[in-house]
Amino acid sequence: QLKDWLNEKGIEVDSLAKAAVEELVENTQGDVAEMMKLRLAMSKTSVKKYEAMERSVCPDGRVHGLLQFYGANRTGRWAGRLVQIHNLPQNHMEDLELARSLVKEGRYDLVELLYDSTPDVLSELIRTAFVARPGCRFIVSDFSAIEARVMGYLAGEGWVMEEFRGAGKIYEQTASKMFHIPIGEITKGSPYRARGKVASLACQYGGAEGALISMGALNFVEEEELKGLVQSWRTANPHIVNYWYEIDGAVKAAVKERKMTKVGMVTVYYQSGMLKIALPSGRVLSYVRPRMTVNRFGSESVSYEGIGTNRKWTRIESYGAKFCENIVQATARDV
């Protein structure tokens, strides 16, 4: 329908993919440009959740099966299904109840009059579409910086654990360690805190410049700074970096020599054609048909068989820091 409408306006398009629509926004004016902006807004993944809700609702008016036990392949974490409730947009609107009642009553003219962006309103109202059964309530919570805590604990990074025993300002403390600045000088809006935060999120599992870029680092630092950020974070976290290499060595020893190695609180070994990693909880991660391979950089690495990013059974190449990610996320799941 939209293509037909554009044809009536004298504009022929082969595709309405995001890139094509963005180009039309730049190169058109008036109602065409406005329509393309609306198209972009309505294609937001969060708004599409309403369609998922409609598809998933059962005869009793409720949605069932939103969480799959042990849904994640290698870590065993719970997996979101159907509506993906693990990543619902946050609420920031002050008059959320008013917006909800207007949409519920179908008074979209007032929504357009009172709010700048109808799609943004719909996005914020997604959480309010979930209603607990009578006599029950939803409690929404999570563990604060759980992966940073678990990684610091497993790797024995003393200052990280000390910070979590106290104020828990891991991003500020990371920036303080990276840039040798007193933590009291690093406020929430500080550019140093922003650097500490993005480095903490991007570098914990061996990430380098590419990981920083994917986390949005170029929004506030120059590209030439990225290598220095990676090095500063690794210098500030020597035990975590060493943990990557210890796990890497243990995994290779298990595959090549069938050797059992204890690395801190985890045990790595080979059994019945599988690489095994025993977690502090006693649960064991298993990697099918592991073998030594040469990676794309020409270095020796371990690969195993599993479901790849293409959702097909394939051979997956891995390395120490990636195994650490599995270990940390699985341990966090056990918590």
What are these language model-derived features?
Residues 179-200, 215, 322-323:
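Active-site-adjacent structural elements in folded domains
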Residues 186, 212, 225-226:
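Small-residue helix-packing motif on alpha-helices
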Residues 1-8, 174, 178, 194-211:
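Core structural elements
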Residues 216-229:
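Short, basic interhelical loop/turn and adjoining N-cap
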Residues 209, 236, 240-241:
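Active-site-proximal binding-pocket segments
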Residues 142-143, 209-212, 229-232, 335:
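Catalytic palm active-site di-aspartate
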Residues 1-186, 243-335:
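Acidic, glycine-rich two-metal-ion catalytic cores of nucleic acid-processing enzymes
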Residues 2, 6, 39, 197, ...:
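Short amphipathic alpha-helical coiled-coil/interface segments
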